Amino acid sequence: MIDADGFRANVGIILANTQGQVLWAKRIGHNAWQFPQGGIDRGETPMDAMYRELWEEVGLHPRHVDLLAVTQDWLRYRLPKRYVRHGQYPLCIGQKQKWFLLRLDEPNTQHIRFDEGKPEFDNWQWVSYWYPLGQVIHFKRSVYRRALQELVPELPLQQGLIIPEQNNHLLVE
């Protein structure tokens, strides 16, 4: 669903383990890594979309995870001009996202799979909480930063995690 301003409603998923690491997934056919995310279908709530995307993209059911937090507001990013499809209506100029922080206990890691529906990822790894800031494609970076900063207080294990300064992409373990 694209709103009147041209932003597609979307959910993002930060899936953390009990050590505070997050699932980082590699897109099929690309050397591009990101958090799982996906559009909200007509009639769906953001929560419904998050659980659907969790199943479609990662193979996990709600029973495998604990919901820790959700961003308060929609976080928006604009697509670079080369990614805007000018021949489509309504015109989508970016995404507005609700971000969800989920916890996955180690025994449920065995349920992670990328063979449901139309797979979008072909590999994954656990990375430190702030690692994605230095790796995600540039136009998503500020949304990732805002989501990670807002949600970090809800992580069960925060020892040693430090919120980076605005321009600092160094990793802190």
Swiss-Prot record:
Keywords: Hydrolase. A motif (Nudix box) lies at residues 38-59. Its EC number is 3.6.1.-. Residues 6-149 form the Nudix hydrolase domain. The keyword Glycoprotein does not apply. It is an enzyme of class 3 (hydrolase). CDD domains: NUDIX_Ap4A_hydrolase_plant_like. InterPro entries: Nudix_hydrolase (IPR020476), NUDIX_hydrolase-like_dom_sf (IPR015797), NUDIX_hydrolase_CS (IPR020084), NUDIX_hydrolase_dom (IPR000086), RppH (IPR022927). One of its GO terms (molecular function) is pyrophosphatase activity. It comes from the Bacteria. Its cofactor is a divalent metal cation. Accelerates the degradation of transcripts by removing pyrophosphate from the 5'-end of triphosphorylated RNA, leading to a more labile monophosphorylated state that can stimulate subsequent ribonuclease cleavage. HAMAP family: Nudix_RppH (MF_00298). Belongs to the Nudix hydrolase family. RppH subfamily. PANTHER family: ADP-RIBOSE PYROPHOSPHATASE, DIHYDRONEOPTERIN TRIPHOSPHATE DIPHOSPHATASE. This is RNA pyrophosphohydrolase. The gene is rppH.
